[in-house]
Regions:
Chain A
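N-terminal, polar/charged subdomain of small-to-medium soluble alpha/beta proteins
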Residues: 2-108, 114, 123-126, 130-173
Length: 173, 85, 173, 85
């Protein structure tokens, strides 16, 4: 029950409109973009893809290790996608999050959406990412020349996530 | 039994990933479970689970505020604020 | 001087931080994402990539043809990237726009940025795209079962672009 | 000479992609050039270049409002509002 080292089961799938995944394997951002764009009916005019990568912080970070709560992390991720897709008219949405050990420059997370129009795509992707940061049970530990330590949650991230609550969604639940 | 999981820095500092508590009349809520754990006198349980610590909780893989009911067979998890993404 | 059918010269380059391109060849969105993420110093924590694709509009659009003003379109695109990079701290930015003939589902444009933090990346990418839509001399003509016609400019696009003027940039010029 | 370019629907409806005008004292600005073109009586010039039409202009590849100065050797372009992206 320490660091998750298994690829979680995919109840969702690349064949449906939503695709979430917690994975130890490196994230293939190109594959994510390709899947988002592959809308056979041609109804998607816009895709927005966000990637978060390990920053080296001027050499202070050489490695990053991500722990999650297996089972719950997948469930929360799937729920966030569903909620965001209820608020904006999305044709496709994905959220892939890596766990385990990675190094500077590696992709930690990729979040993307496809929609008919760009405004909805930008807003939905931004909202989904803000909520992934603050609601999915994932914890970062960074290692550098001075040893390793757990990353503290940032107030700025909580404030960013609250923006979306104030303007609708959460109020309706 | 009530299964209790710890994650990340909390798990590391406690030196435990999981414990179990026998169901009891006084263990009605998440807050009760936390208080029972904080009452342990061995190690750093009192310090790390005290109400002063900012911790989140989940019951059966759903985020749960302190007043959430807990019953026999539940899985309760405690962890620090999340830092993914 | 009708439809541009040449790939414009690249005064900019993949080796610099900014990369704009007007091209007749299909756009490779995966390559765009890869270039954005390839930040060797590891200072970029976030990338946001937008793609605009030809929508079929329920079969009303079978083909799209894009005309541009060769020379001016490249110049304006380069200028927009520079302006956006002055407003937000970007590590990389690209804007590739296709011209000529394309079909439903094809990528028309890809715009992307890399930054240390995600808020800046989302805002800069959204601003750059809004300005590309309203300032670069490009014109769409769509063909469908009922013949072909030029696309009218949308008030919503002008309003979207004005948002960025109201909140800073243009006021400072 | 002043080179004048037309793009997109304007080019198509005029049936011309490019014309030239000899510099003249009365051709001081973009608005003057447009008025000179609208004064042509052959074809649809008067209609398509009239001030009622929403057209943009550029001088030497830079967007130019009607009052922008024009001189010998300049390239002036007229086109409808842009629709890229």
């Amino acid at each position: 029950m320490t660091m998750a080292d298994t690829i979680s089961s995919d109840l969702n799938s690349p064949d449906g409109p939503f695709w979430h995944r917690i994975q130890t394997a490196p994230i293939d951002c190109g594959a994510a973009q390709q899947w988002l764009s592959a809308d056979i009916v041609g109804a998607a005019g816009a895709t927005v893809l966000f990637t978060g990568q390990v920053r080296s912080e001027q050499g202070q970070v050489s490695a990053l290790s991500l722990e999650h709560y297996p089972g719950m992390s997948e469930k929360v991720l799937a729920g966030l996608i569903r909620e965001v897709a209820q608020r904006w008219p999305l044709l496709r949405a994905l959220a892939w999050h890596r766990v385990g050990d990675m190094g500077a420059g590696d992709a930690i997370v990729v979040v993307g959406v496809a929609a008919a129009h760009r405004q909805a795509a930008f807003e939905a992707c931004s909202c989904l990412m803000d909520r992934v940061k603050t609601e999915v049970p994932l914890w970062k530990k960074v290692s550098g020349p001075d040893g390793s330590d757990w990353v503290d949650a940032r107030d700025a991230d909580l404030a960013a996530a609250r923006r979306w609550h104030d303007s609708g969604e959460a109020d309706e639940r | 039994m009530i299964r209790i999981l710890f994650f990340a820095s909390l798990r590391e500092r406690l030196g435990e990933a999981e414990v179990t508590l026998a169901p009891a009349p006084e263990l009605k809520t998440v807050a009760d479970v936390r208080a029972a754990l904080a009452a342990r006198t061995d190690g750093r349980w009192a310090e790390l689970l005290s109400v002063e610590q900012l911790l989140l909780a989940a019951v059966n893989e759903t985020m749960a505020p302190p007043e959430t009911a807990v019953q026999d067979g539940d899985v309760v998890a405690f962890f620090p604020p999340v830092t993914g993404g």
